[in-house]
Structures are given as C-alpha cells and as structure tokens.
Amino acid sequence: MSYSSQVKRAGTHRVIKMLLLLTSAVLLASAPTLGQQQYVSRYDLFAGYTFLDSPKVKLFENGFHFQFGVRPKRWYSLGFDYSVSGGSLTLTPNLLTPAWQQQLGGLLQELGAAGQLPPGYTVVVPANSLTQTLTAGPQLAYRHFSKVTLFVRPDLGAIHEVATPQPKDPITKLIVGALTPTGKKTDWTVFYGFGGGIDFLFSKHIALRVQADLVYNHLFSDILQDGRLTTRFSVGPCFNFGKNIPK
C-alpha cells in the first residue's frame, strides 16, 4: 500500500472513531431527556459531505451526499438518496479475471524475452475515479430520545463509476491500452447492503445527521474477478419541515 493510501486509511479510521465518540457523548448527555418527540415533521432534507472507501481496489473518494424523505408515519419514511464523489483507485494483476491475468502474463513474458522488462518490475495501475450512487426506499426511525433520532435502512440501488487510468511508464501504457482502448472505463451495476445513523436535533427544524452505509457491488465485472464492499460515511445538516405528524 502506498504512503498516500495509508494516510487515507488512517484518516478514515480517525473519522470513524471521532463519530463514535461524538455519538456516545451525545447519547449520554441526552439520557435525562428520554421521552417521545412531540414534533415530527412530514418532510426532511439532508445535504452534506461524504466519503467512499473500497479497500479491495484501494479506492477513496470525497464528495457530496443528498437525501429527501417523506414520512407517512412517525416511525418510517420513504426517500430518495444520491451521492457523487471523486478520488482514486489502484489496480493490480491479482484483481483481474483469470482470462485477463493469462493475457497479461503472456505480454510480460514477451517483454521479458525481448529484454524490455526491468528486473523486479511489478504492474500497478493507478486511476482517477468518479462515482455516483442512486437509491430510493424505506427508512425506520426510533424516536425514544427527545433530542436524538436513530434510524436504519436497507440499501438497494444503482452505482455508476468512471475510472480513468493514469499509466506511469510504457509498460502500463500497453496494459491500459488493452484494458481500456478509449482511455477510460465506465460501468454501472446494482448494489445492496444496509445503513443507518443518528440525527442530533438542535430544534424542531434543524439537526446534524451522521450516517454510514455498507454495500456490495461488482463494478467492471468484465475485467475484475471479484466484487467489493464499499463504506460510505456522511455528515451534514438535516432540515425538517412540513406539518407535525400526529401520534
């Protein structure tokens, strides 16, 4: 793993720890204020920062997350979820399908026989990435705390990714030319998983939302042999508006 990737992973772990500590502190502080929330709005809107982390392909992206929800009842809502983020990933031969690994092995053998392969050479292809996610569905809420709302949800949606390889030497340029003749790789597929989070209520209409999702997808299945798990963390303001939903 490169130094920059290690820094990103360390940053991810620090963010997760900070979010867990913040959640614990707020829950402890809200313990004396147990009780059902008196005001629950019909609609909510979230817009904030997000990051995606897929260790399988060393992907890390920063971006924007948007949600809009309608609450038919106090305990559940139906909503729309969209995120867009950009960053980088890294491809290595072990991630490729057996057919592509065999083709790559043949190419490296030819280069070695011609004396064009440096001693100890390893194939590493960095790439810039842009990812969009789109989903819609239900979310369940627990409102036992007057200042805190807990929620969970299933995740089922579509993910679209554009990967643009950044070859660093003539050999990786040859490999990229075979994998992506157009200079970039685009794909979309379905993902599934689960998510949840916490709304910290500052007033009837304004809250801080902290949330996370863990999903599985298999993007670029024509060249990558395995799917991958992706974590998405988001934080930002949430706005509640509309009429109060009666109990």
List each model region and its residues:
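Cleavable N-terminal export/targeting peptides
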Residues: M1-Y39, G242-K247
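Short glycine/proline- and aromatic-enriched beta-strand/turn motifs that initiate or cap beta-hairpins
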Residues: T33-P72, V84, R232-K247
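Gram-negative (and chloroplast) outer-membrane scaffold detector with strong preference
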Residues: V70-L174, T189, S234-N240
